[in-house]
Amino acid sequence: MIKRISISNFKNLLNVPALECDRINALIGPNGSGKSSFLQAIDFLRAFFLTSVEVYLRDHDWDFRDLPNLREARKTISWDIEAELPPGANGRGAGFYHYKVALSPRRYLGVSEECLEYKASFSSPYELLLNREGRSVQWLNRRTGNNEKFKEIGLPASVISRLEPHLAHDKHPELLRFREWVENFRAFLLWDPKVLRTPDRGKHDTLGPSGEHLAPLLAKLKREKPEAFTKLVNRVKRLFPTVSDISVKGGRAWGWQTLHLHEANGHAVVFNSQQMSDGVLRLLALTSLLYLERIHSVITFEEPENGVHPQLIREVVQVLKELTLRKAPNQCQVFFTTHSPYVLDEFFDHPEQVFLVERGRPLEGATIRRLSQRPQLKIVRDAFEQSLGEAWVNGMIGATAGAKL
């Protein structure tokens, strides 16, 4: 998991000093404050482990010129993260990692600086595994114990992206483990009910950013993990008492597959995905993540409670918390944004898991701090009796819209 992260010059994040992160992290603040920028900056780390950063930009329809903070003259964007990782599938690579990387547009877009340090235990000193400054690259060969020069010039991504696992597993086991962890990040946007209910086909192990592949994903779960699928259905039935079953129709070979919702109240009725409610679809998609065999190492969500009845928002937060309780090698960390005071209420006993995101003036960089650092927190909790959300709406803890109503 990410233990600490610092980001410089990425969109609204002009200079975010080192933030201590938890297994689950909620971001609150007004529109345009920088919450989404923070989530995007985390997911952008995946770009360095593709063949080129440009691939990530094309996939997201981004132009690099739109990424640096508009107030800053320099265009270099930098990340500095510390992470604690469990062992990989091969049982290697557990420990603490410190990774620094900078993205700069010179004659071409590329990585101008990259450094990875590692230690097996918290009390051990860091060992330098990779150091890159411009075209000068050195990395540690575990097999020989020597630092070696990397010879490729003008690499538009991380040096680690060039490693072949079958050739480098004994030379660079920690580099491969770190890459594996970052490659397994997943960013979920606002889940679109239109996308969730659309018939789909093919084999998929997870949902797409906007909720793509829900039908084939559930079909695979029912086929390969029937007990897990039954648990998912039972959980949905508990939330929606009129629901009696969920099924997926079609899908022979590579055919299209469609969700169906069954209800029973004296007589059975079957609704296809086009007739299912938005809230049911969203909760079904979110809850399905709990029962997948493999889960992402870091997940970011944009407003996962969106479209869900207020009485069920507690269930949304509960699912997110349960995702973070999975054991190695499926450990998962969650970052999400919210505008719901009901969500904030669920963190009354853990304000250290809430980040306040604010911007004072136009073009000013975002400030991000833990709610637990607010000096007035104790007074607010005593005054508002179990409702941080009410205190937030009333402007008592900051991160408010500032609208003059």
Regions picked out by a protein language model, each given a short descriptive name:
Residues 16-22, 291-294, 327-328:
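Phosphate-binding P-loop
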Residues 314-405:
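C-terminal lobe/lid and adjacent interdomain/linker elements of RecA-like ASCE P-loop ATPase modules
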Residues 23-60, 282-289, 318-319, 337, ...:
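Phosphate-binding glycine-rich loops of NTP-binding sites
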Residues 89-234, 238:
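Electropositive, glycine-dotted interaction segments
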Residues 213, 230, 234-291, 298-313:
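Conserved ABC ATPase signature
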Residues 1-14:
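N-terminal pre-Walker A segment at the start of P-loop NTPase domains
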Residues 76-77, 107-109, 183-184, 350-353:
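Short glycine-/polar-rich loops that comprise or flank the Walker A/P-loop
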Residues 40-108:
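Conserved P-loop NTP-binding catalytic core
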